[in-house]
């Protein structure tokens, strides 16, 4: 009786009584090879697959899963896209239940979309970013953690936190500004009383009495 394979990771299932004397080798490959080439469960949990330029045609790479417990790109935990692209890229993955950590390290500065083979949609990953995605086995690629190109705040981020918002500071000492800063003259409003001791440019004919 021939072996069968699991639906998602394609691990080999040995029929009862089969592979006498050699089943241990099959089991070891299912668990993970002792060599530098990762297989089976080990590849699915910690394996990293590089997606090079040679895997892409017209900026599209498609990966499938066959009935084999040997190394397969689509089984790897990490998909590291290193290809040189000339436009926005697409990586097609098989219709299985599988989490991926995807690195868009492609050359060319383009985003790459991860999607199920033959379907639209998917998750777009900006160049230089890393994103968790999950294929649910029902033609969907879901993102567990989207990259946020912009962030909206309820209020301006204070200067002390690296922003441009106004911050309140107390204490003594010198105020240090950048070279040639632009100073904005404050609007003081109309005071109701006060003593002016030193000023320039005040027209004395405007509402002023005294000697």
Positions of the model-derived regions?
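Extracellular beta-strand solenoids
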Residues: 93, 102, 143, 150-153, ...
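Short, surface-exposed terminal/edge motifs of secreted or surface/virion proteins that either
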Residues: 31-46, 108-117, 132-150, 180-188, ...
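Short, recurring structural edge motifs at helix starts
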Residues: 120, 159-160
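Alpha-helix capping/hinge segments and adjacent helical runs
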Residues: 162-164
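Short, aromatic/His-centered strand-loop micro-motif at the edge of beta-sheets
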Residues: 117-125
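Exposed extracellular interaction/assembly regions and N-terminal maturation sites
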Residues: 2-112, 187-188
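Tight coil/turn sites that cap or link beta-strands
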Residues: 96, 127-130, 180
């Amino acid at each position: 009786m021939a072996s069968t394979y699991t639906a998602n990771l394609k691990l080999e299932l040995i029929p009862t009584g089969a592979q006498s004397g050699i089943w241990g080798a099959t089991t070891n490959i299912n668990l993970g090879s002792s060599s530098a080439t990762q297989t089976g469960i080990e590849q699915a949990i910690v394996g990293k697959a590089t997606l090079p330029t040679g895997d892409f045609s017209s900026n599209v790479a498609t990966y499938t899963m066959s009935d084999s417990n040997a190394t397969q790109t689509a089984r790897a935990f990490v998909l590291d896209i290193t290809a040189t692209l000339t436009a926005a890229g697409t990586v097609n993955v098989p219709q299985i239940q599988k989490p991926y950590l995807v690195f868009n390290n492609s050359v060319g500065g383009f985003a790459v979309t991860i999607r199920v083979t033959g379907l639209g949609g998917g998750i777009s990953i900006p160049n230089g970013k890393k994103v968790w995605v999950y294929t649910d086995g029902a033609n969907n690629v879901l993102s567990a953690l989207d990259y946020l190109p912009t962030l909206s705040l309820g209020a301006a981020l204070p200067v002390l936190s690296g922003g441009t918002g106004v911050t309140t500071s107390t204490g003594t000492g010198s105020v240090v500004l950048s070279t040639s800063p632009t100073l904005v003259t404050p609007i003081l409003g109309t005071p109701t009383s006060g003593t002016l001791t030193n000023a320039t440019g005040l027209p004395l004919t405007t509402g002023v009495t005294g000697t």
